[in-house]
Curated annotation (Swiss-Prot):
Disulfide bonds: none
Quaternary structure and partners: Component of the DCX DET1-COP1 ubiquitin ligase complex at least composed of RBX1, DET1, DDB1, CUL4A and COP1.
Major localization listed first in the record, in broad terms: nucleus
Name the UniProt record assigns to this protein: DET1 homolog
UniProt-listed InterPro entries: De-etiolated_protein_1_Det1 (IPR019138)
Location of the protein in the cell: Nucleus
GO CC annotation terms, alphabetical: Cul4A-RING E3 ubiquitin ligase complex; nucleus
Entry's family note: Belongs to the DET1 family.
GO biological process: positive regulation of proteasomal ubiquitin-dependent protein catabolic process; protein ubiquitination; protein-containing complex assembly
Role played: Component of the E3 ubiquitin ligase DCX DET1-COP1 complex, which is required for ubiquitination and subsequent degradation of target proteins. The complex is involved in JUN ubiquitination and degradation.
Amino acid sequence: MDHHVSTIKPRRIQNQNVIHRLERRRISSGKAGTHWHQVRVFHQNVFPNFTVVNVEKPPCFLRKFSPDGRYFIAFSSDQTSLEIYEYQGCQAAEDLLQGYEGEILSNGNDQRSVSIRGRLFERFFVLLHITNVAANGEHLNRECSLFTDDCRCVIVGSAAYLPDEPHPPFYEVYRNSESVTPNPRSPLEDYSLHIIDLHTGRLCDTRTFKCDKVVLSHNQGLYLYKNILAILSVQQQTIHVFQVTPEGTFIDVRTIGRFCYEDDLLTVSAVFPEVQRDSQTGMANPFRDPFINSLKHRLLVYLWRRAEQDGSAMAKRRFFQYFDQLRQLRMWKMQLLDENHLFIKYTSEDVVTLRVTDPSQASFFVVYNMVTTEVIAVFENTSDELLELFENFCDLFRNATLHSEVQFPCSASSNNFARQIQRRFKDTIINAKYGGHTEAVRRLLGQLPISAQSYSGSPYLDLSLFSYDDKWVSVMERPKTCGDHPIRFYARDSGLLKFEIQAGLLGRPINHTVRRLVAFTFHPFEPFAISVQRTNAEYVVNFHMRHCCT
């Protein structure tokens, strides 16, 4: 027996040559239903392999690409206007980079480097329109934007602080019996939602919410599903539902909160005539309504019926024991599951108004049918049943790529590698000090409801194509801590290093006492990405693109 012969055979790496892959695609169609996946593999050959550090940009705040990749939006430096750019393609600056070898154009002072950094932005992005949106002292929220499915329009939000003097009237602040008490951590503001036509730059429609609290950051307080837009008023505990028309206008559909049907006021006024009389004279006082808010009433009825179905006296006693606490629950977040169903998170008023930030506070998730006005299900934030639904049907909560003909969601329910990451995270919490299974469930369900359009569809973040450290970059479009080293992307099928992304400046001493954040914006399908590093008030913009070295 020859002991020098290894019994472990090295893994055979598939041919990575792009010509070979093109020829293979030509002569072999592959398994049925895998055509799009086979085409997507070519992103392992065409990737953003070149970084230009510290690109000069106009005085604006960069936001994101439209889902079809044609447009890029930004907010003006004074946050009153929306700037609409047309993307010119990943090859737009290839002539500028002729002769450059390597992977990085650093922050050099030579004339050519300075010229490239100064001209690069206008090569990739051509300004089409500047639309003045915010008025009356309002400022656009830089983290709020929703694109319609046809990529024709974009919805943005603006807000203006209310002055201390004169203080708004009491019944403007408290418009129904569920209204919360504002505080300095959660101040009241005047809000406006605007819809702009990307093709013409025209401001098509605006809806205002005076003396209110709507969480605009990261689209937390508004959700767009196809042509249905839902907006949660945290202050008034009301969900406003609109239909977005192809022409870019808002149509009132329903208002959910104090009432669930539009004609509920007529029914109530038959029993309480003073409600109708006060409404007609402009002296309405719904804050002192003698009845329970309609949406809250449906929640309580569902819980009571569930206690009755249980059949035990203990279930009914628990309902009575916690009845007052259930009445004090307030809506915190919500999302649309489809055109008819809302997914609402209820918690205590202290959490809703940011008086308490303890994530261990009890909360409930409610599935509500807007058409039939029925509560379909209620889950606690420690529910194993809801976690199982979330893990197995995560894509239905994300609605990440509704606009795409072909879906490539990179979630725990559709991607083995994303599932592994989630399992590791779950096991880490279970085994941690003060952890455990219940804490792991609470932490995982803390992601719900999921904000609209908060996940990138870029193939370079697809975990089935590339392996990378999700600590530094991920499919969720949120700022990440900036690392000291480049982010490396390895091909999933071969394990070979394909490209690196360098965020921030090179060669500068790193101050670890200052928190450095970086936000990535990937093009939906082309090999192009933008990273914006923020350190205190300083912004560094890097472009990551495809460059053919000659």
